[in-house]
A protein has these predicted regions:
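Active-site-proximal specificity loops/subdomain of glycosyltransferases
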Residues: 1-16, 20
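Short beta-strand-to-loop acidic/aromatic patch adjacent to the donor-nucleotide binding site
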Residues: 22-33
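Conserved donor-nucleotide/metal-binding helix-loop-beta segment in metal-dependent transferases, i.e.
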Residues: 37-59
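Short beta-strand-to-loop element that shapes/binds the nucleotide-sugar donor at the catalytic cleft/hinge
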Residues: 54-78
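C-terminal, non-catalytic tails of nucleotide-sugar-dependent glycosyltransferases
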Residues: 92, 173-175
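A recurrent flexible, glycine/aromatic-enriched loop bordering the glycosyltransferase active site
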Residues: 96-116
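Acidic donor-binding loop at a coil-to-helix junction in glycosyltransferase catalytic cores
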Residues: 132-139
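Active-site donor/metal-binding and catalytic loop motifs
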Residues: 146-149, 153-171
Length: 175
């Protein structure tokens, strides 16, 4: 087990959950806070339940609320996103999930800083320890390749409190 990269650190969290015999691992990043007193109750809501299509919910994601109170990404004005705005695509996904009739819906997106994994999933599918960024999307792809899905809970979130950006434009572009 390594401590280099988000995937490797999350695998350490999964290993600790296994050592202590926990059946659910909940992840948050260090620049987030849980403002809801029922955060952990909402984290496990629906886990191991079956959908009407007889699909078992083993991994789910909540979402981020930015410092202004919005779950949507601000459109980037950087030249690096001139031709393809990740924010625009992300906001389409979020709007569809936020306005869904059901609280928990199937998702192609996972917020790595607000996710819950049941042992039935994380004992079969670890995070890729060699991925330094984007481990959440990679995990969704790995789930799919093993016949599982990620689910989105539109009533479970964390408040994002990012530190002041100190990286150079070149460094941000490389990420």
């Amino acid at each position: 087990v390594s401590l280099r990269g988000y995937g490797a650190i999350k695998n350490l969290g999964l290993a600790i959950a296994c050592v202590f015999g926990h059946d659910v691992a909940v992840f948050m990043y260090d620049d987030e806070i849980a403002t809801d007193p029922d955060f952990l109750t909402k984290a496990v809501f629906g886990l191991t339940a079956y959908t009407r299509q007889d699909l078992k919910i083993l991994v789910k994601s909540g979402f981020f609320i930015d410092p202004e109170g919005s779950p949507y990404a601000n459109p980037a004005k950087s030249w690096t996103e001139r031709d393809w705005s990740k924010a625009e695509q992300f906001n389409k996904v979020m709007e569809r999930a936020q306005n869904a009739k059901n609280r928990v819906t199937r998702s192609n997106h996972m917020c790595g800083g607000c996710c819950a994994l049941h042992a039935e999933a994380f004992t079969r599918i670890p995070f890729d320890p060699y991925i330094t960024r984007g481990e959440d999307l990679d995990y969704v792809l790995n789930l799919r390749s093993h016949g599982l899905d990620c689910w989105f809970d539109n009533d479970w979130c964390v408040q994002l409190r990012p530190p002041e950006e100190k990286a150079s434009d070149a460094s941000v572009f490389m990420q």
